[in-house]
Amino acid sequence: MSKQPLRVGIGGPVGSGKTTLTLSLCNALRNRYNVAVVTNDIYTEEDAQFLVRHQALAQERIIGVETGGCPHTAIREDASINLEAVAQLSQRFSDLDLILVESGGDNLAATFSPELSDLTLYVIDVAAGEKIPRKGGPGICKSDLLIINKTDLAPLVGASLEVMDRDARKMRGERPFLFSNLKSGEGLDQIIDFIERQGLFKT
């Protein structure tokens, strides 16, 4: 009987940095763990093609799922299309350690079905404004790790990282969050450490 891989859901609004995070995680983890990816796009397989072009993983380790008009349905209410992709990858690579499931562009109410994801990372970006953490929603309040990305843009959009920090603490209680600039790699080590600790790869 093959082992069950850890399934990590990566959610967040369009443009927040989900695909950059997925690429960064693949680059950092592929030599340490047996990794595969499922991406969700509304009408194309653009994110999957992006990962292949950037040599995140071998092409056969990446499956792109087309969700149609409701990307959140494919990760929550009816996750069957994603569960099928996860099953295909698990069959193709019997010793997988980790499957990253990147959602399509979500609204703040989107969450992963517990059937599909063991651990959820939710990415928001500073450019969307400092008010985003206090808007709440399941991704911001209930994800296992909230990632506030693109910290370098704060001065350009007039966003206060201090306000975002305060609001994230208020909305999340004890749940962890961190600031990142995935373009430069800032915060990536902390994200990897979180996945390894929560996924029992590291004690």
Curated annotation (Swiss-Prot):
Gene Ontology biological process terms in this record: urea catabolic process
Organism: Nitrosococcus oceani (strain ATCC 19707 / BCRC 17464 / JCM 30415 / NCIMB 11848 / C-107)
Family: Belongs to the SIMIBI class G3E GTPase family. UreG subfamily.
Name of the protein in its database record: Urease accessory protein UreG
Quaternary structure (record): Homodimer. UreD, UreF and UreG form a complex that acts as a GTP-hydrolysis-dependent molecular chaperone, activating the urease apoprotein by helping to assemble the nickel containing metallocenter of UreC. The UreE protein probably delivers the nickel.
GO cellular component, one term: cytoplasm
Function: Facilitates the functional incorporation of the urease nickel metallocenter. This process requires GTP hydrolysis, probably effectuated by UreG.
Keywords attached to this entry: Chaperone, Cytoplasm, GTP-binding, Nickel insertion, Nucleotide-binding
Family annotation (NCBIfam families): ureG
PANTHER family associated with the record: UREASE ACCESSORY PROTEIN G
Binding residues for GTP: G12, P13, V14, G15, S16, G17, K18, T19
